Regions:
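Buried hydrophobic packing segments
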Residues: 4, 26-29, 75
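C-terminal binding/interaction regions
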Residues: 44-101
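Mid-chain, well-packed structural core segment of small domains
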Residues: 18-64
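Short alpha-helical segments enriched in small residues
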Residues: 1-15
């Protein structure tokens, strides 16, 4: 997870997807990298909302938790949803990013 998160944080790529059996370990690992907002996802609605409201740049999936078809639907939704740009959502992100300092 760390190499993917570092690639996103450095600007080498825009977004990253990380997987392990539960998704928990990779999400914790990715979130240790400054500039990363990783969400562990197991449903389509959360995939959409985490992009709209939190501008997540890494998503984690548990391969032993979600089946292949659902995982693909979650990834498609997450990749296809843009950040809302709403001021209240940006303030929330700014507060989260300030915790890294």
């Amino acid at each position: 997870a760390a190499p993917a998160a570092k690639a996103v944080a450095s600007g080498e790529c825009e977004k990253g997807i990380v997987l392990c059996t539960t998704g928990i370990g990779v999400s914790i690992s990715a979130n240790k990298v400054d500039g990363i907002r990783c969400a562990l996802l197991s449903d389509v609605w959360s995939a959409k909302m985490t992009r709209l409201h939190n501008d997540t740049n890494v998503m984690a999936l548990g391969a032993g938790v979600v089946g292949e078809n659902l995982a693909l639907e979650i990834a498609d939704t997450w990749l296809g949803t843009e950040f809302s740009g709403d001021e209240r959502h940006q303030r929330r992100i700014d507060k989260l990013m300030a915790l890294e300092k």
